[in-house]
From Swiss-Prot:
Expressed in larval and adult hypodermis, hermaphrodite vulva and adult excretory cell and duct. The keyword Isomerase does not apply. Keywords: Disulfide bond, Signal. Residues 135-184 form the BPTI/Kunitz inhibitor domain. InterPro entries: Cuticle_assoc_divergent, Kunitz_BPTI, Kunitz_BPTI_sf, Lustrin_cystein. Appears to lack serine protease inhibitor activity in vitro when tested with bovine pancreatic alpha-chymotrypsin and elastase. Involved in cuticle biosynthesis. GO terms for biological process: cuticle development involved in collagen and cuticulin-based cuticle molting cycle; protein catabolic process; vulval development. It comes from Caenorhabditis elegans. Changing residue 56 to L: In 518; blistered cuticle associated with abnormal localization of collagen col-19 in dorso/ventral annulae and lateral alea. Loss of struts separating the external and internal cuticle layers. This is Kunitz-type protein bli-5. The gene is bli-5.
Amino acid sequence: MVSIHNSFILLMLMISICFCEKCLTNEECDLKWPDAICVRGRCRCSENTIRKKSASREWVCLATNDATGNSGPPLTCPTPEGAGYQVMYRKDGEPVKCSSKKKPDTCPEGFECIQGLSILGALDGVCCPDRAKTCVHPIFDHPDDGYLSRWGFDGEQCIEFKWNPERPSSANNFKTRAHCEDYCIGSINGITNYHQSNFHLF
């Protein structure tokens, strides 16, 4: 009797693991990451982006090009798209590399290891702000020379601002309001554990 009960629990656990990332529509994927589409029950990142695992978001899309359209660096963070290299955790000015396969993660609190675009070897990733820390980064508004519309979380809601990708930025930078709201308002309970004073650009 006990073994049947344990087998049933194991079966239910396997079903929940198998179906936790299933998608039915393009809209639900697009909400989680702009322009992602649902292909055979799995969200697929758009052209010029690659899907990578994320401990705080399940998955993220990394841009293969920088925000100006040129080939991007092999190590980058998911946001801001095309300029994620600006927000990597650094020590003595150098990006802190990590292993995306090692558990637990070796990144400091508030950061998670995101695998690079084309990096091989034991240290195949870089420490990026996790979901909660991303949402408490300051918004870098560039009203004078910003030419791209972006959205950032101000602690209460997502607001629109102008962004110049060639100037310093923070991870609190999203292409769409829906992406900002899903990223930040969807995890608002975890956000209160972080403070803006923990933010360091480099």
